[in-house]
Amino acid sequence: MESPFYKKILLKLSGEALMGDQEFGISSDVIASYAKQIKEIVDLGVEVSIVIGGGNIFRGLSGAAQGVDRVTGDHMGMLATVINSLALQNSIEKLGVPTRVQTAIEMPKVAEPFIKRRAQRHLEKGRVVIFGAGTGNPYFTTDTAAALRAIEMETDVVIKATKVDGIYDKDPVKYPDAKKYQTVTYNEVLAKDLKVMDATAISLCRENKLPIIVFNSLDEGNLKKVVMGEHIGTTVVAD
């Protein structure tokens, strides 16, 4: 059997990615594709934990612009991530992979509370663990939650699934001459304000020397390639 380069990963999925071609909500095709790709790497023996955003349902920051109190909006966003987490859990378990959802805000009838040791035990037993409700605190993004959980779970890498094939110096959709980075340092990301993750998440990863790989998850098979050590997308590394 092939041996994975990364044996323990944190996969960060954006809520928007789950929409597919829809304007909001969850595309059954997209979530089934993610589940299939996740099963592929679990079958290789990789320990997989996941954090999903909630932007396909509600985003706290844009809610604040529409008159929703920021703290209330962020709590609404956290609940949106739990909806996405349950949907992904359902899709992964349909493929026969045992999956647990742990939330930063306790909701015992829906999911387990986040307990580090329990989460690690699930991973050791070959279960996928999905972390919902962000960090449980307003003003912190799901990117920061992903960095935090990755550090707590002692993962080898944070893998950020996006709609583009890496990190560019400017928006490749708007600017055809945008330059793609193969590798970039944490400090460059912060200094150039490259839209990878927010500054808090990048700082956490830098402090803990946790590499970040940004890749296009819309092409099936890419997640497996990343885990096997194939260089696709962009890697954020230490200086």
Swiss-Prot record:
Catalyzes the reversible phosphorylation of UMP to UDP. CDD domains: AAK_UMPK-PyrH-Ec (cd04254). Homohexamer. The keyword ATP-binding applies. The keyword Zinc does not apply. Its EC number is 2.7.4.22. PANTHER family: URIDYLATE KINASE, URIDYLATE KINASE PUMPKIN, CHLOROPLASTIC. One of its GO terms (molecular function) is UMP kinase activity. This is Uridylate kinase. ATP binds at residues 12-15, 55, 59, 162, 168, 171. It is found in: Cytoplasm. It comes from the Bacteria. GO terms for cellular component: cytoplasm. Inhibited by UTP. Belongs to the UMP kinase family. UMP binds at residues 54, 74, 135-142. The gene is pyrH. It comes from Fusobacterium nucleatum subsp. nucleatum (strain ATCC 25586 / DSM 15643 / BCRC 10681 / CIP 101130 / JCM 8532 / KCTC 2640 / LMG 13131 / VPI 4355). It catalyses: UMP + ATP = UDP + ADP. Pathway: Pyrimidine metabolism; CTP biosynthesis via de novo pathway; UDP from UMP (UMPK route): step 1/1. InterPro entries: AceGlu_kinase-like_sf, Asp/Glu/Uridylate_kinase, Uridylate_kinase, Uridylate_kinase_bac. One of its GO terms (biological process) is 'de novo' CTP biosynthetic process.
